[in-house]
């Protein structure tokens, strides 16, 4: 195992012993906030230290087996034990590295899902509607809740743009690799010659910012406009200026919400979207710097980056970042995204592991 990783594991083992002593101290247990903080730290490092202790025990077993192998009487038994112990060490090392990987602090958050029609005119808007249905069906399968924040329907169906909030444990961890350009190849219903048309939509997945996100907005930097909602909602919505648009003047970032009947609720939702977009911009700037040194296997997540092609005549979906092709387009468009999401997450983790080993 890499010496740097061994040193890190040794430090964690020492820290675990320190935490056990602290948590048994009455003065510590009397301070509930500090007790919770230390308990949380212990729960985070205990699994990897347990794996490390097992690794050390197997190392000792391997050393014993190698000593036994020089004795002709025990050679066959010892060699079998050596092979088994080496495999155990490799398996445990993989688990240790996974435990040491930096965790995305946003993984458990809700998300804002933004889908926008791109090139392809009406067909692009229709595909935006198909993508929204796909993600909505996936959310339904996961037991998540979907709330439409704003929508701009197309005259022919689908959406020029739709923004939704998806509420559910781990929503960001499952869908964060969906950001990018999605290309569709199919024969439009209006096509009389049977020609395949190509259209695109862009998808953005933003983790919802929480109240302690660290973003403080100066009211002087905000322009808040109210207007009459143009979407669904009935006569009441169209008679009142319930829709809200907030512009962050320093960055030019805009967020709006018009789905609720209450201007107050729409303003709160628009503010949440705005803060999430500002945070997303900051994170992307950091990721761009990191990507300059090492390009991630699953891509940068840039909105303009083509990540996936949906070819309906061939019944296939190809994710270009990991060269994965699945011939199950109907199931995927109906929200069966587990195989795609899991494979992307696994490839991302493999890239992280490779980078850790190289260091």
Swiss-Prot record:
Methylated by PrmC. Methylation increases the termination efficiency of RF1. Gene3D superfamilies: 3.30.160.20, 3.30.70.1660, 6.10.140.1950. PROSITE patterns: RF_PROK_I. It comes from Nitrosomonas eutropha (strain DSM 101675 / C91 / Nm57). Peptide chain release factor 1 directs the termination of translation in response to the peptide chain termination codons UAG and UAA. The keyword Protein biosynthesis applies. InterPro entries: PCRF (IPR005139), Pep_chain_release_fac_I (IPR000352), Pep_chain_release_fac_I_sf (IPR045853), Prokaryotic/Mito_RF (IPR050057), RF-1 (IPR004373). One of its GO terms (cellular component) is cytoplasm. It is found in: Cytoplasm. GO terms for molecular function: translation release factor activity, codon specific. NCBIfam families: prfA, PRK00591.1. Its main location: cytoplasm. The keyword Cytoplasm applies. The modification N5-methylglutamine is found at residue 235. Keywords: Cytoplasm, Methylation, Protein biosynthesis. This is Peptide chain release factor 1. It holds the Pfam family RF-1. Belongs to the prokaryotic/mitochondrial release factor family.
